[in-house]
UniProtKB/Swiss-Prot annotation:
Region span, Disordered: 73-93
Coiled coil: none
UniProt keyword annotations, A-Z: Membrane, Transmembrane, Transmembrane helix
Primary location: membrane
Protein name, UniProt field: Small integral membrane protein 36
Protein's cellular compartments: Membrane
Keyword Transmembrane helix: yes
Source domain of life: Eukaryota
A Gene Ontology term for the protein's cellular component: membrane
Membrane-spanning intervals of the chain: 14-34
Length: 93
């Protein structure tokens, strides 16, 4: 006495579809655990992330000429007059 279970082709396709989604979800979760969910390879060592306190401050220094030099000829297109001396400016960031 043999017993055969007949499965409708639509039901079989649905079972295969659900099983494939479950397998893809398991592969994703396993890879997320292995790769620390940040895309970093666990077999490589990474430098620790720098904090804001450990970074050095950046100092910007802007130099302006106080007197126009002879290498800048004044032509008819340059009618700026006599610019006031600007000096040295610095900005601490």
């Amino acid at each position: 006495m043999e017993f055969y279970l007949e499965i409708d082709p639509v039901t079989l396709n649905l079972i295969i579809l659900v099983a494939s989604y479950v397998i893809l979800l398991l592969v994703f979760l396993i890879s997320c655990v292995l790769y620390d969910c940040r895309g970093k390879d666990p077999s490589k060592e990474y430098a620790p992330e720098a904090t804001l306190e450990a970074q050095p401050s950046i100092r910007l220094v802007v130099m302006h000429p106080s007197v126009a030099g002879p290498h800048w000829p004044k032509g008819p297109g340059l009618s700026l007059g006599d610019p006031a001396p600007l000096g040295k400016k610095s900005t601490m960031v």
